[in-house]
Regions:
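Catalytic glycan-binding domains that act on GlcNAc-containing polysaccharides
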Residues: 71-257
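Hydrophobic single-pass membrane-targeting/anchoring helices
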Residues: 2-38
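Compositionally biased, intrinsically disordered low-complexity regions
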Residues: 13-19, 39, 61, 140, ...
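N-terminal export signals and maturation junctions of secreted/periplasmic proteins
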Residues: 27-103
Length: 257
């Protein structure tokens, strides 16, 4: 272990350098004409659009905190970005809506929709891993359940939820499109679709929970070190960081076309 530490540290240092070099591509407030705006939160839907709830009084705008995250993004943006990136529109609504919600809740975080989408791609192929699909209602079907963390090829993590979240009362398993551990979901689980419950298998709930988790600790994700710290808190390892980074950069580039 000691002999490998310098290599691992060098890898992380190199990755941080890459993040700092491409931060304009991956994260909000980019200055690059090629990707300007691609990594920032998408346009917000107007109150008059059919997908948004009716205002309480004439001319009033709905409170974004009370609107399901999937209804927050502009429909035309979703259609165009889904076509250019290949991310299914229903799932893209969850990523983009969660980024918009965090723009209101924690504006200093500056979370790009493409960072959420990159994690979703790496963790579950946008909810399609092992033959699962995300339904029009936003639910992964069949439910996405990760491997048992039994100490084999993965770290050992004994059951923390009596199997209530992951169906395994011996070992913990990551669940849902964003692959939350039961103990993490217990703390960060969110209700993104406004149905009164937090469901890790629902892409809106999972995306909003992931957004809040990444932004905690007053991080500014336009800063390379903060971005790396956020991804590290989600899943450690320079290889994982590099995969998420590549996905985030690719999605931003595709969306800008």
């Amino acid at each position: 272990v000691r002999e490998r530490l310098p290599v691992l540290c060098a890898g992380l240092a190199g990755l941080l350098g890459v993040v700092l070099l491409v931060v304009a591509v991956v994260l909000p407030d980019t200055e690059s004409d090629a990707v300007k705006g691609a990594a920032s939160a998408p346009p917000e839907a107007r109150a008059s659009t059919s997908s948004a709830p009716q205002a309480a009084s004439r001319g009033a705008q709905p409170d974004p905190a009370q609107v399901p995250v999937a209804q927050l993004p502009d429909g035309a943006w979703i259609e165009a970005t889904a076509a250019s990136t290949g991310v299914e529109a229903r799932v893209l609504r969850a990523y983009a809506g969660a980024a918009l919600r965090l723009e209101r809740e924690q504006p200093g975080c500056r979370l790009g929709w493409n960072t959420l989408a990159a994690i979703g791609a790496v963790e579950s192929e946008h909810g399609t891993i092992d033959g699962s699909v995300v339904t029009d209602d936003g639910v992964a079907d069949p439910p996405i359940i990760g491997v048992a963390l039994d100490g084999g090829d993965v770290r050992a993590l004994k059951d923390t939820d009596d199997g209530e979240v992951d169906g395994d009362d011996r070992w913990d398993r990551a669940v849902g499109p964003m692959q939350f551990l039961p103990s993490t979901w217990e703390r960060w689980g969110a209700d993104g679709d406004g149905d009164g419950r937090a469901d890790p298998q629902h892409v809106d709930d999972a995306a909003l929970a992931a957004a809040r988790y990444l932004c905690h600790g007053e991080r500014d994700l336009t800063r390379g070190p903060d971005w790396v710290a956020a991804i590290s808190s989600y899943n450690e390892g320079s290889e994982y960081h590099a995969r998420v980074l590549e996905q985030a950069r690719s999605l931003a580039s595709l969306a800008a076309r």
